[in-house]
Amino acid sequence: MEYIILIPAYEPDNKLVSLLKKINNKYKVIVVDDGSTNKDVFEAIKDYSYIISYDNNMGKGCALKTGFKYIKENYKNYVVVCMDADGQHDLKDAINLCDYAKENLDTLVIGKRYWDDKTPWSNRTGNKITRYVFKKKTGMSIYDTQSGLRAFSYKLMDYMLSIPGERYEYEMNVLLDLKKNNIKYHEIDIKTIYIGDNSSSHFNAFKDSYKIYKEIIKHSK
């Protein structure tokens, strides 16, 4: 079964180049350029990945689903692992998630980070609040609801494509709809990596958090 690494990327820096060179064509890599204006990084990784590009920034959810559609149309038996472009996911962790998904084809596998005093306060607090609200509204216990490192097999592709949301709220919607669709999930411990002040992230603390909590409240009604 083929492992496919999917990376949505908006204005990435050289950390994406480093990741792709580390992978070094050992696995199939698909990068979705979500309307970036600077193409230098994409030029640097063209020998290490298949790149899908479009002109306007559509959001992470849209980029993920664009990649999913391409994979569904071009592959049959596979496991997809979604990684972020900011260098905060470890390749070994990604492959561990793939290994579990390969043996559990009907399960969404989620990378679970742990936070300590070295973790930025805003990240630590935000994840704790989201975890509490998510459990309160859904009854599901997921420790790391905001983890972008996730893997699943071809059996869940139609589910992943059916989920609404074009930006960061998409990843939360994937979790919110698990229960009503009787889809299993499993969390696996991964490294918690924060590079500098997390400046590579394009997550808007206010705007994107508002959309995420809005979706949680909507699903609980």
Where do the PLM segments sit?
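Hydrophobic targeting segments
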Residues: 2-7, 16, 23, 28-32
